[in-house]
């Protein structure tokens, strides 16, 4: 829930779709502020936010079921534009007097939309009489329209694929414009918020920076502030915002648990101490962490051990400073959204960062969460606004438990060193191939498999690694980026391998 009032807001009502966050990201990309709220609290949110327009999301539910989710009637009484997506279209029709039935022919995946009429919703992208690819995912279908609606788009299995009441500015689409598989979907959503709702593109990270800094100053006053700096983008951007707001009232603590990427600790320390003059305490606790993980093979127990030790070390260092009144935390908007239950109602508490969970209560600190209204891509833009280098902002996501979670079995310094080096080699080759920025995430995993061989007469132990890569473009609704077959061989080229006298060979 936003703590700041934005005059031009779009309200997104979430009926439980897996891709609702993508709707919000597309609206934010159009430089318009929006909030996602679960349908259970939509009435309250509508009164509080007074949005200029509303988007109704998809849902796994069926409007034909008794007790299925509905949009607040106040939305349709307010005289503001409404866009229903998939289930959102269906519930809008059902609530306004139309009819929805369970379909015999379900429509999932790529489909083709035939544009029947020109509309402001299609301005600049689709014209009457043309056909375009969209992405469908529905079983139910609209079978009759409420008064005032007309059909402006059809598909072979959805005769009411796009409907409109142009007078009241109500629109419904049976497909999902928020996913990349609808190529013009983002532009369609832009048309809704800019042309139909009439909201101007005023949501920028420059404006957000000013508001966030002022909000931190107001919250903190003359209090003492600490921040757990992990070296990741989120905590770094949060720390810079806090430092801009309160200066030397802030002290950052970086706990080196020995599980970070190659040269990461040194890079973070140099950047924040030398470039930003940010008060930073570096704590080398690697022996403590690695010692506790040495005989542990269960990934969940590893994560909990790391979390527990982090709290212990951070708490010890914070007490050396004489305690603090506030703790800066890099909570993001998805953390807030994901803390809401769509079966039991909104959660009272917000999901804590895995590393600092429990610290505010134990040390009687108040949380400062300057990023809680932002998505990850917006945090990167804010980081750029704050002057963080592109090479830092664009780094791939890295898990809180670090390399320990990519090292099956017990953790040792030798295993970590092998994995750290292999990961660096892999990412170096990804960069050389010009693929780093196209891939959301790529990393090496040390497999618990070994064999022996000889290389030029030298006996060696061969350690097997898995090279993984995630979806491309940071889209999270995409797929895997195919690599050339010879790419893994390049990563294992002899010029990357240490002398067999000193290091095992990695395959």
Curated annotation (Swiss-Prot):
UniProt keyword annotations, A-Z: ATP-binding, Glutamine amidotransferase, GMP biosynthesis, Ligase, Nucleotide-binding, Purine biosynthesis
GO cellular component, one term: cytosol
Record domain Glutamine amidotransferase type-1: where: 9-202
EC number: 6.3.5.2
Gene3D superfamilies, alphabetized: 3.30.300.10, 3.40.50.880, HUPs
Xref: PROSITE patterns: GATASE_TYPE_1 (PS51273), GMPS_ATP_PPASE (PS51553)
InterPro entries attached to this UniProt entry: Class_I_gatase-like (IPR029062), GATASE (IPR017926), GMP_synth_C (IPR001674), GMP_synth_GATase (IPR004739), GMP_synthase (IPR022955), GMPS_ATP_PPase_dom (IPR025777), NAD/GMP_synthase (IPR022310), Rossmann-like_a/b/a_fold (IPR014729)
Reaction equation(s) it catalyzes: XMP + L-glutamine + ATP + H2O = GMP + L-glutamate + AMP + diphosphate + 2 H(+)
Residues the record marks as active site: 86 (nucleophile), 176, 178
Domain GMPS ATP-PPase per the UniProt entry, residue ranges: 203-395
Residues the entry annotates as binding ATP: 230-236
GO molecular function: ATP binding; GMP synthase activity
Pathway given in the UniProt record: Purine metabolism; GMP biosynthesis; GMP from XMP (L-Gln route): step 1/1
PANTHER family listed in its UniProt record: GMP SYNTHASE [GLUTAMINE-HYDROLYZING] (PTHR11922:SF2), GMP SYNTHASE-RELATED (PTHR11922)
Assembly, per entry: Homodimer.
Chain's role: Catalyzes the synthesis of GMP from XMP.
Protein's name according to its UniProt entry: GMP synthase [glutamine-hydrolyzing]
